[in-house]
Amino acid sequence: TDRLVKSIVNSLNENQEKSKDWLIEKSKQYFTFFKNPSVVVAAGWYGHLASKMKEYTKGEVVSFDKDPMCKKVGHKLYRGKDIIFTDADIKYYDVKRFDIVICTSCEHLGQYLIDEFLKRRKKGSLVILQLNNYFSINEHINCHNNVVEFEKSLKLEKILYRGTLKLDKFEQWM
């Protein structure tokens, strides 16, 4: 359908690409904390970031999204990349077995859901989160005004990196 095609194209747009590349550029130094880390990308859409992460590990890479179509499309787009796609809700997904836990869609999730999701990770895992201030998108229910506000909302023990990526109409934080 047209809606699906637009969604796939949007998942690969310039801002998405810049955001994913920025995540890897600023985070890859921490991947070495683990030998062949296992990685989970929550709300991973069609798996573009999971595909990029696969270049940095021989460990398991999982991309999950609550939309079952993301799994179907992801399998087709990234066939042969050894990525596990699953349709699951972040509300229930168990992330305990993963060394690296990523969510680049925090603006789509309520704060309570993010907090509960992070409580389920294993101690010592690397958490990489992104959120933006693109308030004008209806689905963006959890935007913040700046990176400090975002950071405070997370209640994390230790912050290894914080930064801002300026994009066309908004800023992205990590």
Task: Report each predicted region and the residues it spans.
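C-terminal substrate-binding/active-site "lid" region of AdoMet-derived donor-dependent transferases
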Residues: 111-174
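Conserved SAM-binding loop of SAM-dependent methyltransferases across substrates and taxa
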Residues: 46-57
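S-adenosyl-L-methionine
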Residues: 1-34, 66-100
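A short SAM/SAH-binding and catalytic strip from SAM-dependent methyltransferases
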Residues: 98-113
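Conserved SAM-binding motif I beta-strand of class I
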Residues: 59-65
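Conserved class I S-adenosyl-L-methionine
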Residues: 34-46
